[in-house]
Amino acid sequence: MYRAASDTKSLAISAATKEVFSYVEALKHGFFLVRKTKLLTNTSIKDIQQVLEHNNAGFRRVPGTTLKNQLGEIVYTPPQNADEIEFYMANLEKFINDDTISELDPLIKMAIIHHQFESIHPFFDGNGRTGRIVNILYLVIKELLDIPILYLSRYVIRNKGEYYRLLQDVRVNNSWEEWIIFMLKGVEETAEQTIYLVKQVSIMMAEYKFKMRPVFGKVYRHELLNNLFNHPYTKIEFIMNDLGIKRLTAAKYLDMLVDLELLKKIKVGRENYYLNTKLIDLFMNFSVEVQDNELNRIITTHE
C-alpha cells in the first residue's frame, strides 16, 4: 500500500493493491462529499465511481450490458436505455434522501437501496464497489456511523455466492425478506468485528504511549502517537505536517521510534518509510482469524 501511495503507476504494484488504494480514496472522497450536506446525490455517486475507476464515463449510455453466471449464461439484463437508467437513478436518489417516502428503519432501507442500485447497474465498471461505498455513506448520512469504518465488502466477498443468489431471487421471486436478513447479518457481523478491532488498536496505542513518554519527555505529543496509527506506515513528511516541525526533528523522532522497536524503517526507491509492523500484524492476523472462523462455521453447519 505504501508503494501504491508513492507511485500508483509502478509495475511492482499488484492490481489488487491498486484496487484497494482506489477504494480507500473513493470512500474518503465520498465521506467528504456527504458529511456536511447529509445528502447522497447521483452527482456524488458518479464522483465516487470516477475515483474508483479513474474515468469520467458517468452512467451507461450504450446498451449491451448483461450479468452472467460462472458458466457464462445471462442471468439478468439491467436497464439498457440511457433515459431509463437516468429515470431509475433519479428515483433511487429521491428514495435515499427523502425520508417522507418511507418510514423503514435505515438498515432495512440500506438493504433495499443496495439491491436497487445493483439491479440498475448504472455504470459499465465498478458497480459492486460503488454500491458497497453507497451502503456505508448512507449509514453516515443517517448518523448510524460517525465515520465510514464499517467494511461490509469483506462480508459480501466472503459470501459472494449467496449474495448473488439472493440478489437474483428478489428479482425473480420478490424474496425481499431473505435478502434483507442477509444484509442485516452482514452489518451485525461486521460491526462486531470492527468493535473488536477498534478495541485492540486502542490497547496498542496505550502501550505505545507508555513506551514513548519516558523517552520523549517534554517533547512528547499526542499528535505523534496519532500519526503512527493513521496509516500502517508513516514518513518524515507526514510527521512534519502533523506536528508542524522541521525535517531534521521529524527524522530524529522517527529514529527514536525505530530504536524503541515501535516502527521498522525500510527504503522504497529514494524514500524511507516507517512501518508500524505491530499494527500491520494486528490487521493481518485479524483477517486470517475471520477467515478461520468462517471456515469453522461452514464445517459445523455441514457436519
Question: Where do the PLM segments sit?
Answer:
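FIC/Doc superfamily catalytic core
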Residues: 1-303
